[in-house]
């Protein structure tokens, strides 16, 4: 028989930087999860994704055990890294803060497509390009 699920927690945590302080500690503590066990497992699983915030979905069971799924970093983080910028434009219609090539967009799509709501590479590229434009990043050929 399957374990009874008592909760699901969604967080964004910096890769390899999970620790018992807020927001991780309080969110897991309310469900009775062993916080240090989660932190060690998360940090181990994300050691090759350093520098990104990683979305994680933690499923908590009635016996206080847990499983978690890490997803790819948010598209905005991938765009900022590829464009070499620290933040998006304050007025993206007037100010352009960086440039991305179509090849860089497709590279981001290949990393991100598993977490997107489309499996079509061209549609996923349009979504990423729209996110880039809304950040003030110009798409060039």
Swiss-Prot record:
Keyword Ribonucleoprotein recorded: yes
InterPro entries found in the cross-reference section: Ribosomal_uL11, Ribosomal_uL11_bac-typ, Ribosomal_uL11_C, Ribosomal_uL11_C_sf, Ribosomal_uL11_CS, Ribosomal_uL11_N, Ribosomal_uL11_N_sf
Function: Forms part of the ribosomal stalk which helps the ribosome interact with GTP-bound translation factors.
Family stated for the protein in its record: Belongs to the universal ribosomal protein uL11 family.
Domain of life: Bacteria
A Pfam family assignment: Ribosomal_L11_N
Entries under SMART domains matching the protein: RL11
GO molecular function, one term: large ribosomal subunit rRNA binding
Biological process (GO), any one: translation
Protein name: Large ribosomal subunit protein uL11
Keywords recorded for this protein, A-Z: Methylation, Ribonucleoprotein, Ribosomal protein, RNA-binding, rRNA-binding
Subunit annotation: Part of the ribosomal stalk of the 50S ribosomal subunit. Interacts with L10 and the large rRNA to form the base of the stalk. L10 forms an elongated spine to which L12 dimers bind in a sequential fashion forming a multimeric L10(L12)X complex.
CDD domains xrefs: Ribosomal_L11
PTM comment, free text: One or more lysine residues are methylated.
One cellular component term from this protein's GO annotations in UniProt: cytosolic large ribosomal subunit
């Amino acid at each position: 028989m399957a374990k009874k699920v008592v909760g699901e927690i969604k967080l964004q945590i910096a890769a390899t930087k999970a620790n018992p302080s807020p927001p991780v500690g309080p969110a897991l503590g309310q469900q009775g999860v062993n916080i240090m066990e989660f932190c060690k497992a998360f940090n181990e699983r994300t050691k090759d994704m350093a520098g990104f915030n990683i979305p994680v979905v933690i499923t908590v069971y009635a016996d206080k055990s847990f499983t978690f799924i890490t997803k790819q970093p948010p598209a905005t983080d991938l765009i900022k890294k590829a464009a070499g910028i620290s933040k998006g434009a304050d007025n993206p219609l007037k100010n352009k803060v960086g440039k991305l090539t179509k090849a860089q967009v497709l590279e981001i799509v290949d990393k991100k497509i598993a977490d997107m709501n489309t499996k079509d590479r061209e549609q996923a590229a349009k979504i990423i390009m729209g996110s880039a434009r809304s950040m003030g990043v110009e798409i060039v050929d």
